[in-house]
Every structure is written in structure tokens, then in C-alpha cells.
Regions:
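Hydrophobic small-molecule pocket/channel-lining residues, especially in calycin-type beta-barrels
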Residues: 21-153
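Positively charged n-region of N-terminal signal peptides that target proteins for export
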Residues: 1-10
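Bacterial N-terminal signal peptides
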Residues: 9-18
């Protein structure tokens, strides 16, 4: 009985890992500043990590704010279009991701129930590049648009 339980647990772990690695969004993504176009005053997310967290996905974002101070935020949820809490970001308290196809996500960030940022995340066909196109309103109420490129690590 113990052998069967252990075997089942290992099989589930390997299945979860296979599903996770099959998703091109998963992994560590590093900012390619030379290929990116930032709106003035918008924080720069230098490293973004997508990883499995049980049946959910955990996204960890490390970067710099407009003053050059280190930032760190985390989101854990599903790519189902529903809002899940964000921790560590003063400009958003909820974020949702919706899977459009195997390489594309739609993202919406909210603060106090109000949409502050929305955009699209597309992984290249070769899986080596990720382009994030977003628009929204910054903390000062100014509209912005950015196109940010990341390279898979």
C-alpha cells in the first residue's frame, strides 16, 4: 500500500511538472531594456518568474520603481480571468490573467476594484522572448502605454 501511495504521489508530481513546463509562459524572464519602450515614470520589472504552485501559478516580480528603489510583488492564482490578490505592490491589490491561447495572456490589474493597468503578454513562437504590451493610469492619474520585452533565462 505504501509503495502504491508513493508511486501515485511521484506520478502526480511528474505530471504537474510536465504540464507546467509545457506552458511557454512558465519560467524566469529577464528584462531586455534595449528592446523595450517604457512610459516615463513607470516602474521597471527587471525579473519575472512564473512557477507552479500546486494547481495555481505563482508570479514573482522584482524590479525598480520610478525613483530606482527595489520593488517586489507576488501573485498566485489561475489563468481564468478572475481577480486574485497581489502582495507587495502599492499600485495594485488584485490582478487577473486570462489565457487567450498557448502563447498569449490578457492581464488586468486593479486597485480598490478600479482597473489601473490592462494588457497582453505574448511569448514568441520559439519560446525565447516575451512581449508585454500594457496601458493604464499611473499613481499620479496620468495615462501611459509601454511595450516591454523579456528574454527567457
Amino acid at each position: 500500500m505504501k509503495t502504491n501511495t508513493t508511486g501515485l504521489a511521484l506520478a502526480l508530481c511528474f505530471f504537474g511538472a510536465a504540464v507546467c513546463f509545457a506552458d511557454p509562459q512558465m519560467g524566469t524572464w529577464k528584462l531586455n531594456e534595449a528592446k523595450s519602450k517604457f512610459a516615463a515614470g513607470v516602474p521597471k520589472n527587471e525579473m519575472v518568474v512564473y512557477e507552479a504552485a500546486g494547481e495555481n501559478v505563482k508570479i514573482t516580480v522584482d524590479g525598480k520603481d520610478k525613483d530606482g528603489n527595489a520593488t517586489h510583488n507576488e501573485w498566485t492564482g489561475k489563468f481564468d480571468g478572475k481577480d486574485y490578490p497581489v502582495t507587495g505592490d502599492p499600485n495594485q491589490d488584485a490582478r487577473s490573467y486570462k489565457k487567450v491561447n498557448d502563447r498569449t495572456l490578457e492581464m488586468t490589474a486593479k486597485k480598490d476594484g478600479k482597473v489601473t493597468v490592462s494588457g497582453r503578454i505574448v511569448v514568441s513562437a520559439d519560446g525565447k522572448t516575451r512581449t508585454v504590451t500594457v496601458g493604464g493610469t499611473d499613481a499620479d492619474g496620468k495615462k501611459f502605454q509601454s511595450k516591454v520585452v523579456y528574454d527567457k533565462q
